[in-house]
């Protein structure tokens, strides 16, 4: 199983276009030990030619240009993208679909009923794409409750089994499900390659660690999970907003019950954080917070990172 990190930043990327926080300002001035990040998305493959995308960020065109493997060049119009799995309906995870409108056939998009509802009403991307390539929607089935959904395969991606996992996070501000949780608003994905018997749990939007989530985290070979904020009040400390991390659907890394303490007892998985907000001090590779992560055996994803399982 091959995983390529197309983008590792949270909404707005890093530096964010209108932000002059401690991180963004220093990066622009060139006195920051760290790198820019586009908005989060990953691609997975088992053969290096055919790929499934997980989320489609607004930065997708640049991300694809920096990833030659996804353009095999077999015909005048070609792509290695065989399908797109949406984990939620957030703007920074879905608007990249519009950049793929020149596709010569319908986009095969896999998402839950809740996400489909948002993308045909409040943020009607699917409706817009009806006038271009159109969308072939593949519903992801989730039972009511906390159990993972039905496993599935993306057509054209041989040997990769995907299982949707309901997560407690937050629907986007435009959604009627904002602060009104419905199963399927946000999912994680369990990726498994039967040939290698390796697995990865991908959850860039993770607000709570429920029992069924922890169970998967304990047995995964690799965790690629929410690293948005360092502290619960990070945005308030930066003078940006009074919204808390968990209010926005993200479990912070530090503090009691934070991601670091959750990951501490897990000795087997490769632990990687993704979806890093521009305000997070871990972006600074010389920061005390980054050193704390490294001491805990936790890595930080970067654009262009490859994970081979």
From Swiss-Prot:
Cited SUPFAM superfamilies? Metallo-hydrolase/oxidoreductase
Q: Name one Pfam family in it.
A: Lactamase_B_2
Keywords of the record, alphabetical order, are:
PQQ biosynthesis, Transport
Where exactly are the transmembrane stretches of this chain? none
Write down the superkingdom of origin: Bacteria
InterPro entries from the xrefs?
Metallo-B-lactamas, PQQ_synth_PqqB, RibonucZ/Hydroxyglut_hydro
Q: In which pathway does it act?
A: Cofactor biosynthesis; pyrroloquinoline quinone biosynthesis
One record GO biological process: pyrroloquinoline quinone biosynthetic process
User: What is the role of the protein in this entry?
Assistant: May be involved in the transport of PQQ or its precursor to the periplasm.
**PANTHER family with a match to the protein in the record:** COENZYME PQQ SYNTHESIS PROTEIN B, HYDROLASE C777.06C-RELATED-RELATED
Similarity section: Belongs to the PqqB family.
Q: What NCBIfam families does its record include?
A: PQQ_syn_pqqB (TIGR02108)
Q: What's this protein's name?
A: Coenzyme PQQ synthesis protein B
Q: Which gene encodes it?
A: pqqB
């Amino acid at each position: 199983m091959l995983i390529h990190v197309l983008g590792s930043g949270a909404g707005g990327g890093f530096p964010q276009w209108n932000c002059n926080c401690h991180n963004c300002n220093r990066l622009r001035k060139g006195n920051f030990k760290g790198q820019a990040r586009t908005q989060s998305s990953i691609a997975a493959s088992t053969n290096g030619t055919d790929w499934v995308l997980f989320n489609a960020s607004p930065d997708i065109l640049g991300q694809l240009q920096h990833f030659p493997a996804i353009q095999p060049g077999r015909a005048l119009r070609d792509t290695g993208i065989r399908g797109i799995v949406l984990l939620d309906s957030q703007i920074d995870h879905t608007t990249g679909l519009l950049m793929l409108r020149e596709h010569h056939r319908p986009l095969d998009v896999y998402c839950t009923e809740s996400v489909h509802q948002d993308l045909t009403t409040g943020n009607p991307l699917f409706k817009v794409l009806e006038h271009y390539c159109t969308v072939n929607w593949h519903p992801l089935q989730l039972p009511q409750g906390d159990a993972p959904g039905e496993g599935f395969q993306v057509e054209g991606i041989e040997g990769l089994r995907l299982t949707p996992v309901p997560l407690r996070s937050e629907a986007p501000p435009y959604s009627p499900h904002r602060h009104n949780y419905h199963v399927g608003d946000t999912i994680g994905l369990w990726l498994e390659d039967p040939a290698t018997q390796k697995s990865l749990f991908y959850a860039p939007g993770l607000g709570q660690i429920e029992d069924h989530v922890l169970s998967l985290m304990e047995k995964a070979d690799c965790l690629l999970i929410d690293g948005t904020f360092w502290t619960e009040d990070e945005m308030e400390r930066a003078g940006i907003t009074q919204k808390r991390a968990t209010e926005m659907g993200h479990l912070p890394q530090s503090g009691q019950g934070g991601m670091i303490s959750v990951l501490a007892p897990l000795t087997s998985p490769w632990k990687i954080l993704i979806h890093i907000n521009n305000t997070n001090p871990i972006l600074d590779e010389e920061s005390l917070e980054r050193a704390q992560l490294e001491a805990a055996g936790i890595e930080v994803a970067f654009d262009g990172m490859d994970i081979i399982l």
